[in-house]
């Protein structure tokens, strides 16, 4: 709009910084790929000061603090933090206000294996290092915000912790700031061969931290508390709530931590309830989805089974959804669902009814989901197996998972060189130094193997995550190799198709594509009549 353009023009004039270059795409890149938000801003609680990442000719070594005065333009203060880190190229992955004049900033080097936590003074621009983590491979959970005590003397964050031969798992660390020296001491509050997913709240009155974890199962999420003093006693607050149908939860606490909202997401029909923190057994059901539950009970839906496969010294989960009339005497096509990025998880206890459910019930297709090496929430050892060999080891696992099935189709999203650079470099390294790694992960070398296959490519023209050049390069090689393909374009849609009409069209396209090719290639064999005894 003209008004927004007017505001932007004023902002540009008031931020007087000779030589500073602003790039819209880089702003998105930092915001969504690193901070996991769409706008790279961090607001103080009273909404009067904003910390904002900027790009300079010397890489992202400047932070802009914008003071809002209720007018159309924003006078700004520029804080240069050179000298804080030992490397020239780094990312800011997290900014959190500690007080009106101090911010906590996490810096990540370009290879993403060195993370430095600093406290920066907004009035002087000076930053002091408080905590550093180094790794031989990339570091995950770098956009997570620490949870602070009210006086700022201690804060809690999720860090990788070694757990014997099983490797590292994410756990909660309490960092205490020494009053006189401002040095930080660290105490680990949790440990074990399971993952802390998210820190939800800190109650100073009871001195307890509340968090979600995979302690019971990597496929589930349970709400736990742990004491920050004494023997660090741990308690599960959700384990006894509707345990027959609820093992996967999310939760949110009230401002004073007296109550919490518990969202059961599966495996049964989702349920939302409010609980008293001091007595979780005292609760009120807000939504039980009774109509949905009754509808499902009336229908004969598909059966789901989870198998553990032993591959390369790992026990990896394979989830199979069978048609309602499945029998061992028939032959079925298998659709393997592949997620888009390392650290993702497909085999969970979440309630799931999606487009692929239609294929299972209507087209008698077995749908498989598999979490192989490179998947998340099973420890860092499994996750980091794809380091410098993405597109190789996880593909071997996927082939092993379906090798007993005669007919297989795949549905995946996106894997690298034309991908967002921070994402690609995290797993494959810097292109100029790791050209062989990028080449090894490319599908273009095996393009002739697709000659006899059916291929559907879907891309939104406004996709800023995987640029359209990615698909264009693939199509160019498909044409050269004489491979037939179908291309579906969605104008003005991003990486995730957003509008309802576009989503309906996308699902119809995918269902039609798989239904046609799977029926053609893997017809169900007629059942043989059983002999009377």
Language model region names:
Residues 1-253, 258-259, 265-270, 347-348, ...:
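Beta-propeller folds
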Residues 2-14, 115-118, 273-274, 330-331, ...:
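Short, solvent-exposed loop/turn and secondary-structure capping segments
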Residues 40, 106-108, 120, 132-133, ...:
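Generic beta-strand/beta-sheet core signal
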Residues 48, 61, 129-130, 185-189, ...:
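Conserved beta-strand positions that form and line the central face of beta-propeller blades
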Residues 97, 148, 365, 490, ...:
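Conserved hydrophobic/aromatic "anchor" residues
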Residues 110-111, 120-127, 132-136, 168-196, ...:
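Active/binding-pocket-proximal capping segment
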Residues 135-136, 289-408:
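Cap/lid segment of the alpha/beta-hydrolase catalytic domain
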Residues 369-533:
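Active-site-proximal cap/loop segments of hydrolase catalytic domains
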């Amino acid at each position: 709009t003209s008004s927004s353009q007017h505001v932007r023009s004023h902002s540009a004039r008031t931020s007087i910084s000779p030589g500073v270059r602003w790039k819209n795409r880089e702003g998105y890149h930092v915001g969504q790929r690193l901070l996991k938000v769409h706008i790279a801003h961090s607001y103080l609680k009273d909404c009067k000061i904003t910390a904002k990442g900027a790009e300079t000719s010397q890489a992202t070594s400047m932070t802009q603090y914008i003071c809002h005065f209720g007018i159309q333009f924003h006078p700004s203060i520029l804080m240069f933090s050179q000298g804080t880190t030992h490397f020239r190229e780094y990312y800011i992955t997290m900014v959190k206000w500690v007080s009106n004049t101090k911010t906590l900033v996490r810096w990540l080097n370009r290879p993403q294996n060195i993370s430095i936590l600093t406290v920066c003074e907004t009035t002087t621009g000076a930053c002091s290092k408080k905590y550093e983590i180094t790794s031989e491979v990339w570091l995950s959970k770098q956009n997570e915000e620490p949870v602070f005590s009210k006086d700022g003397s201690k804060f809690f964050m999720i860090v990788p912790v070694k757990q014997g031969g099983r490797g590292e798992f994410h756990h909660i660390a309490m960092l205490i700031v020494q009053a006189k020296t401002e040095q930080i001491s660290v105490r680990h509050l949790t440990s074990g061969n399971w993952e802390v997913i998210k820190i939800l709240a800190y109650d100073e009155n009871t001195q307890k931290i509340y968090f979600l974890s995979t302690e019971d199962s990597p496929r589930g999420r349970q709400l736990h508390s742990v004491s920050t003093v004494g023997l660090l006693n741990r308690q599960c607050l959700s384990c006894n709530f509707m345990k027959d149908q609820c093992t996967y939860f999310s939760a949110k606490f009230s401002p004073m931590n007296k109550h919490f909202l518990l969202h059961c997401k599966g495996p049964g029909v989702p349920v939302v309830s409010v609980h008293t923190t001091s007595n979780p057994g005292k609760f009120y059901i807000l939504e039980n989805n009774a109509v949905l539950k009754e509808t499902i009970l009336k229908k004969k839906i598909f059966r789901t089974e989870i198998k553990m496969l032993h591959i390369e010294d790992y026990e990896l989960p394979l989830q199979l959804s069978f048609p309602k009339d499945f029998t061992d005497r028939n032959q079925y096509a298998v659709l393997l669902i592949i997620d888009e990025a390392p650290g993702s998880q497909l085999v969970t206890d979440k309630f799931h009814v999606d487009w692929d459910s239609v294929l299972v019930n209507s087209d008698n297709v077995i749908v498989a989901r598999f979490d192989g090496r490179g998947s998340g929430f099973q420890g860092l050892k499994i996750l980091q197996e794809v380091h410098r060999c993405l597109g190789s080891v996880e593909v071997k696992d996927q082939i092993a998972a379906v090798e007993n099935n005669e007919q297989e189709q795949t549905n995946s999203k996106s894997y690298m060189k034309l991908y967002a650079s921070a994402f690609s470099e995290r797993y494959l390294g810097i292109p100029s130094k790791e050209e062989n790694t990028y080449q090894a992960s490319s599908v273009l070398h095996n393009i002739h193997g697709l000659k006899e296959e059916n291929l559907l490519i879907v891309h939104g023209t406004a996709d800023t995550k995987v640029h359209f050049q990615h698909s264009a390069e693939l199509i160019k090689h498909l044409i050269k190799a004489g491979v037939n393909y179908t291309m579906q374009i969605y104008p003005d849609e991003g990486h995730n198709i957003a509008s309802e009409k576009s989503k309906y069209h996308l699902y119809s396209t995918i269902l039609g594509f798989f239904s046609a090719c799977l029926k053609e290639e893997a017809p169900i064999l007629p059942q043989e009549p059983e002999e009377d005894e």
